[in-house]
Amino acid sequence: MRNRIYSAGQVPAVACVVPDVVLRSQKAVQRYLNAFQDCLQRAWKPVVVRAGVRFRPSAVYAVRQGSKTACGTFAEKDHAYYCPADSGIYFDWEELGQWEDYGHVAAQVYTLVTMAHEFGHHVQELVGISTYYDDRWGEVAGSAHLEPMRRHELQASCFGSAFLGANQTPLDLYGARYEAYLSEASYGDHPPATARDHGSPQSNTEWAAAAFTAMSPAACNTWVAPRAG
């Protein structure tokens, strides 16, 4: 599909400083998410504007299971999601505390990758790709819904990796943090996934690698790629 975001140029590096907090309380998680969202807004705004679209900021909320959102009740399976109804990104802050059990680096990088992905959905919403996705989804039924879902999700992750590649230095994505990024960026519909709606680990790895290197949404037109899992 054609969209001006693909020719809008690279995502810029920004002065991105996130607090080195332990992600075990709602207050700490909200502080971390707020700081990182600010980085995402400042980096993506000029790209979206160059695509000919007015930039609208997102919001981010650290919530727990059972919380009411503009897109319904936040459930156990949700982990994190973008809600187009209020341009809100919702995170299960208690789950991030569980990630701290795997190590502080793992918890922080998981949050960065997930937040960058969800903000990728915000970019899709702003530039009209989400409307295109809704149209494609409405043209099919049953399991055929999975293909447009995979393309949509892979693209959001790809946009996230374009930002992370551009901001590798300010986010210190080197050494153990870079290895943690590679692990998270490769995560997909591992067998036996109940629904193959986010793309295979191989597809996620390939799109992430291309975007991280290119630092540009030009590397992320998943809609014209050959069909894959």
Explain the meaning of each model-derived region:
Residues 2-6, 186-229:
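Pan-zinc metallopeptidase signature
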Residues 151-187:
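Short helix/loop segments within enzyme catalytic domains
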Residues 20-29, 33-42, 49-72, 139:
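Acidic helix-start/capping segments at beta-turn-to-alpha-helix junctions
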Residues 65-92:
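Catalytic zinc-binding patch centered on the HExxH motif and its immediate surroundings
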Residues 44, 113-126, 156-157:
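Active-site recognition of the HExxH zinc-binding catalytic motif
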Residues 1-24:
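Non-catalytic architectural context of zinc metalloproteases
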Residues 125-152:
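Post-HEXXH active-site segment of zinc metalloproteases
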Residues 96-114, 147-148:
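Short pre-active-site segment immediately N-terminal to the catalytic Zn-binding motif
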